[in-house]
Regions:
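Membrane-helix interface motif
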Residues: 34-38, 196-208
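Hydrophobic cores of alpha-helical transmembrane segments in multi-pass inner/ER membrane proteins
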Residues: 55-64, 155-165, 230-241
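N-terminal secretory/membrane targeting signals
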Residues: 2-39
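Alpha-helical membrane segments and adjacent membrane-interface helices in multi-pass membrane proteins
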Residues: 95-158
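Hydrophobic transmembrane alpha-helices
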Residues: 36-114
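Hydrophobic alpha-helical transmembrane segments
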Residues: 53, 81-86, 125-129, 152, ...
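Short helix-perturbing small/polar motifs within transmembrane alpha-helices
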Residues: 153-196
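C-terminal transmembrane helix-loop-helix hairpin of multi-pass membrane proteins
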Residues: 179-189, 209-263
Length: 263
C-alpha cells in the first residue's frame, strides 16, 4: 500500500514537472516566430574580423569545460536532462523578448542566471551558445561572425557573476529568494556592461577613448535594461520556487540545496 502511494506521488510530481516544461517550450515556440529587431546581441558584421576571432578564442575553454560538465551530470543522473532543457529554454525565451529603448536601441533579458545557479557558469556557456546560434540563423538576432563576442558577454561573463553572487550570499544568512534575485539581476546587468566594453574596444571614442565610448554605450542600454534586470530577477525567483515545490528530487540529484532543508 505504501509502495503504491509512493508511486502515485512520484507520478504526480512527474506530471507537474512535465507541465512546467511544456509551458516553457510553448512560450519558446511562440517567440520563435516573433518579428526580428535590432537587439542587444551585437549584429552580424558589426565587429572587425580580428575582434570576432579573438572573442571566439576566449570562449573556447569555457565551452569545452561546459560540455564536459553537462555530459558528466547527464551520465551521473539522466533525470537532470529535464532541468538542463528547462534552463536552456528559459534562456531562449527571455533573450528573445526584445524591448525597444527610448534611445533607439533594443534590450532584452538574458535568462542565464537560472542555469548558472543550478549548473554553474561553464555549463551555461554551452546552453547560451546553442541559443545564440539558433537566434542568429533563424531569427536574425545577433550574428555568426559576432557569435564569440555575444557568447562571452551573455553566456560566460554574466553567468560567472551570477554564480559568484549566489555562492557567496548562500554562505550568509540572507534569504534564499533575495540571493537568487540578486544573482540573476546583477548577472543580467553585467552582461550589458561587458557588451558595452566590447563595443568600446572595437570603436573607441575620438575624445576619451575606450572609457568614454563604453559610457556612451551603457547610456544607450541603461533606460530599458535596469527595469528588465529587476524583472529577470523576479522571474528567476518564481521559477526556483516552482522547482523547489515540484522538482525536489531532480534538484537533489544535481546537489542543489532546497530552501526548507537549509533552514
Amino acid at each position: 500500500m505504501k509502495k503504491q502511494r509512493k508511486n502515485n506521488t512520484e507520478k504526480m510530481k512527474n506530471k507537474k514537472i512535465s507541465w512546467l516544461a511544456k509551458a516553457v517550450y510553448a512560450a519558446a515556440a511562440i517567440l520563435a516566430v516573433a518579428p526580428t529587431a535590432n537587439a542587444m546581441h551585437i549584429m552580424e558584421g558589426y565587429l572587425p574580423p580580428a575582434f570576432c576571432i579573438a572573442w571566439g578564442i576566449v570562449c573556447l575553454p569555457f565551452l569545452v569545460f561546459g560540455f564536459r560538465s553537462l555530459n558528466r551530470r547527464v551520465q551521473e543522473n539522466r533525470r537532470s536532462i529535464t532541468l538542463i532543457a528547462m534552463a536552456g529554454a528559459f534562456v531562449f525565451v527571455l533573450s528573445s523578448l526584445k524591448i525597444p529603448s527610448v534611445t533607439g536601441s533594443c534590450s532584452h533579458m538574458t535568462g542565464t542566471g537560472l542555469g548558472a545557479i543550478l549548473f554553474g557558469p561553464c555549463a551555461v556557456s554551452v546552453l547560451g551558445i546553442i541559443v545564440l546560434i539558433f537566434q542568429a540563423v533563424l531569427l536574425a538576432h545577433g550574428g555568426l561572425t559576432t557569435l564569440g563576442a555575444n557568447c562571452f558577454s551573455m553566456a560566460i561573463a554574466g553567468p560567472i557573476l551570477s554564480w559568484l553572487i549566489y555562492k557567496g550570499l548562500s554562505k550568509t544568512r540572507i534569504n534564499r529568494r533575495i540571493t537568487v534575485f540578486l544573482a540573476a539581476s546583477l548577472g543580467d546587468l553585467f552582461t550589458y556592461c561587458v557588451t558595452s566594453v566590447q563595443l568600446a574596444l572595437a570603436y573607441p571614442s575620438a575624445q576619451g577613448g575606450v572609457t568614454a565610448s563604453a559610457v556612451k554605450f551603457l547610456g544607450i542600454f541603461a533606460p530599458t535594461q535596469l527595469p528588465l534586470a529587476v524583472i529577470e530577477g523576479i522571474l528567476t525567483v518564481v521559477v526556483v520556487i516552482a522547482l523547489e515545490s515540484f522538482a525536489k528530487s531532480e534538484l537533489k540529484a544535481i546537489d542543489f540545496e532546497i530552501e526548507e532543508e537549509k533552514e
